[in-house]
UniProtKB/Swiss-Prot annotation:
Annotated GO CC locations: nucleus
GO molecular function: DNA-binding transcription activator activity, RNA polymerase II-specific; sequence-specific double-stranded DNA binding
Modification type Phosphoserine: residues: 223, 297, 490
Ranges annotated as DNA-binding: 78-173
Expressing tissues: Highly expressed in spermatogonia, spermatocytes, and round spermatids within the testis (at protein level).
Name of the featured protein: Forkhead box protein J3
């Protein structure tokens, strides 16, 4: 009994504590704060404390009236009633239980002399209470009751107060027409759709700074779309010349090295050849595609082009596409005062017999593109500054018996997979940076310079467009790869190793290319030119000329100062052509750069530079 008696207080205290805590946190009482509950509470208060105190809350009782005794008590001073109570007293004193605003004013002044001399401020308060208080209802006059102003009455059944609700936010449109950071693809000329069975589609996502490539034939899971971890660097993106929409450019692979900022094109640079082929008439679009693994896309394209030929020769078993992603950026280069045409290469089955290796149009042309792999760049810096004077010769490039260090028209092999970060198309030293070059598989000619030698490039978007156009017209089924067994074996080894080639392996690959081109006569070795020299000072070239051998077109670049040297690793493009007027300087100090393009598709003429250097190269010896 004693224990029970002692336990009772503790149990009671615990219950009280729990009730107190729940009352502090519970919100059940909030919806009960309505006008009706307040009126009922006022009635209880009136019954408990008498009529005198409840008069201040007369507003809460629609039937409250004012006694004459109370009027006499507060006749001399300010009455202790709220404005709502005064309105209630006035309306309830009327036999019709309604009054106009002027009648309410008059009743208050008659019963409480204080308001006669209090000014007009209290009248504003009366109007506010009438319009804001839910207990008062505005009653319009009937037609048979002429007069001014509406009546005010007491609402005996006011609407229940509802809990205030937060206003709904307007739903944001999921897709906005344009964002502050979106770039009009039409103005940039970045859209490209490549037609053709095996031609890839390139896409540049300018918002995310990503470059993408995919095979148009592949769809769904077939086309690699994994995210590209290494997007374009800010420097490379900023260097892209977005204003040069109207000119054609050649591709250059981009290694991670700095270079002068791109400059806007001059009107002379914006001249663009007319493409009369039906393949070229299609609009270039690639903003719709957002495929982001460039490395895997190249491997897929490489397989689609060479798998059949290599499988027949027993040279290659293609492994599954590796998800490893290489740092690739898309870039294209623009010559300052001349249109740089991309250098495709002839896909005829027999190279020795057909030396039109650089036919840019027709069904056999290919855009030159190169993969830039971070593994292959010895220099970690994104860009090496461009050297204004003679660049050091690179020992890593023994594979080039370059006939002219100045001949830098790049020959691309049939494998777009060739990872040469070192194959560089000519870079204008004081011109734009070049972001990386994609490479749809070019036909079987490629001379790669310098293994592991990094250099700096940047370019403009138009070069990418032009390469897309050229790649779209290639008929890959006609390419004869039987004479490139050694090259294909090297490519197969590179593909098996996920293109992680060291410098020695890359040098071997380049050397085998060089040996093949030398044996076939495409490269005429010269004793006066060091083999490890891949580029030299560039000099004015002859005006562009049409070449009759295999619908080639020669596009000359404008002269550069002798002190300005092109970036290291710029590959040769010696052309085997027996054409008058085609000039290339054989000496180390000067060169006439010529770009071969089909004459039928590119009817272009350029004025002859005043300081043109005559060519002393024996073209007959090559043919």
């Amino acid at each position: 009994m004693g224990l029970y008696g002692q336990a009772c207080p503790s149990v009671t205290s615990l219950r009280m504590t729990s009730e107190l805590e729940s009352s502090l946190t519970s919100m059940d009482w909030l919806p009960q704060l309505t006008m009706r509950a307040a009126i009922q509470k006022s009635d209880a208060t009136q019954n408990a404390h008498g009529t005198g105190i409840s008069k201040k809350n007369a507003l809460l009782d629609p039937n409250t009236t004012l006694d004459q005794e109370e009027v006499q008590q507060h006749k001399d001073g300010k009455p202790p009633y709220s404005y709502a109570s005064l309105i209630t007293f006035a309306i309830n004193s009327s036999p019709k239980k309604k009054m106009t605003l002027s009648e309410i004013y008059q009743w208050i002044c008659d019963n409480f002399p204080y308001y006669r001399e209090a000014g007009s401020g209290w009248k504003n308060s009366i109007r506010h209470n009438l319009s804001l208080n839910k207990c008062f209802l505005k009653v319009p006059r009937s037609k048979d009751d002429p007069g001014k102003g509406s009546y005010w009455a007491i609402d005996t059944n006011p609407k229940e107060d509802t809990l205030p609700t937060r206003p709904k936010k307007r739903a944001r449109s999921v897709e906005r027409a344009s964002t502050p950071y979106s770039i009009d693809s039409d103005s940039l000329g970045m859209e490209c759709i490549i037609s053709g069975s095996a031609s890839p589609t390139l896409a540049i996502n300018t918002v995310t700074n990503k470059v993408t490539l995919y095979n148009a034939d592949q769809d769904g899971s077939d086309s690699p779309r994994s995210s590209l971890n290494n997007s374009l660097s800010d420097q490379s993106l900023a260097s892209v010349n977005l204003n040069s929409v109207g000119s054609v450019h050649s591709y250059t692979p981009v290694t991670n090295h700095p270079e002068p900022v791109s400059q806007p094109l001059t009107p002379q640079q914006q001249q663009q050849p007319q493409y009369n082929l039906p393949e070229r008439e299609k609009q270039l679009l690639f903003t719709e595609y957002n495929f982001e693994d460039l490395s895997a896309s190249f491997r897929s394209l490489y397989k689609s082009v060479f798998e059949q030929s290599l499988s027949q020769q027993g040279l290659m078993s293609i492994p599954s596409e590796s998800s490893q992603q290489s740092h690739t950026s898309c870039s294209y280069q623009h010559s300052p005062s001349s249109t740089v045409t991309s250098h495709p290469h002839s896909n005829q089955s027999s190279l020795p017999n057909n030396h039109s290796g650089l036919s840019a149009t027709g069904s056999n042309s290919v855009a030159q593109v190169s993969l830039s792999h971070p593994q292959m760049h010895p220099q970690p810096s994104p860009h090496t500054p461009h050297r204004p004077h003679g660049l050091p010769q690179h020992p890593q490039r023994p594979q080039h018996p370059a006939p002219h260090p100045q001949q830098h028209s790049q020959l691309q092999p049939p494998h777009s997979q060739h990872p040469p970060p070192h194959q560089h198309i000519q870079h204008h030293p004081n011109h734009q940076h070049q972001t990386l070059a994609h490479q749809p598989p070019p036909p079987p000619q490629q001379v790669s310079c310098n293994s592991g030698v990094s250099s700096d490039w940047y370019a403009t978007l138009d070069m990418l467009k032009e390469s897309c156009r050229i790649a779209s017209s290639v008929n890959w089924s006609d390419v004869d790869l039987s004479q490139f067994q050694g090259l294909m074996e090297s490519m197969r080894q590179a593909d098996l190793k996920n293109w992680s080639l060291d410098q020695v392996q890359f040098a071997d690959l380049c050397s085998s290319l060089n040996q093949f081109f030398t044996q076939t006569g495409l490269i005429h070795s010269q004793s006066n030119v060091p083999q490890n020299v891949c580029h030299g000072a560039m000099h004015p070239a002859k005006p562009s000329q049409h070449i009759g051998a295999g619908n080639l077109y020669i596009d000359s670049r404008q002269s550069l100062p002798p002190s300005v040297m092109p970036p290291p690793g710029y590959p040769h493009i010696p052309q085997a052509l027996n054409t008058p007027g085609t000039t290339m300087a054989g000496h180390h100090g000067a060169m006439n750069q010529q770009h071969m393009m089909p004459s039928q598709a590119f009817p272009m003429r350029r004025p002859l530079p005043p300081d043109d250097i005559q060519d002393d190269f024996d073209w007959d010896s090559i043919v």
